[in-house]
Regions:
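Glycine- and acidic-residue-biased ligand/ion/polar-headgroup-sensing regions
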Residues: 59-79, 86-88
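Histidine-centered metal-chelating micro-motifs
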Residues: 53-55, 73, 90-103
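Short acidic-glycine-tyrosine-enriched beta hairpin
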Residues: 33, 37, 48-49, 78-95
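N-terminal targeting signals for Sec/Tat export/insertion, comprising classic cleavable signal peptides
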Residues: 29-61
Length: 129
């Protein structure tokens, strides 16, 4: 017997009501770092809709985050949760697992810039547990 909650989730999926909570990621720049063999720089913007969040993941890269709009909550495994507002920054190292990445607001969007220094050709995001 299906619970009422499961029926509601399935109904939302069928109508697309749950779509829209995923972040919008836009590549701004990708550049081979010729002075650092095998590395490339990648700049992205990430827009979280109200209530938006990321799954647990890692970048296998040095990641520098700078908040442009709204408020975001970030945390790497073993670190403290940080709520960031415009003008604040956050760092993720190549061995870090990003366990919290979400919009702090359920009513307003948030936007930030990510600059990654990573192995050339390596995936930008790797799912993690």
């Amino acid at each position: 017997m299906m619970s009422t909650r499961l029926i509601l989730v399935l109904a939302c999926l069928a109508t697309g009501s749950l779509v829209g909570h995923e972040p919008k990621v836009t590549q701004v720049l990708s550049k081979d770092l010729t002075d650092i063999p095998g590395k490339e720089g990648l700049m992205l913007t990430v827009e979280y809709p109200p209530g938006g969040s990321d799954p647990v993941h890692r970048h296998n890269a040095h990641g520098f985050i700078y908040v442009l709009e709204g408020s975001v909550v970030m945390q790497v495994r073993g670190g403290k949760e940080a709520t960031l507002t415009p003008g604040q920054s956050f760092y993720e190292g190549p061995d870090d697992v990003h366990v919290v990445g979400r919009n702090a607001s359920q009513t307003k969007p948030a936007k930030f810039v990510v600059f990654l220094v990573k192995d050339k050709g390596a995936p930008v995001v790797v799912p993690a547990k």
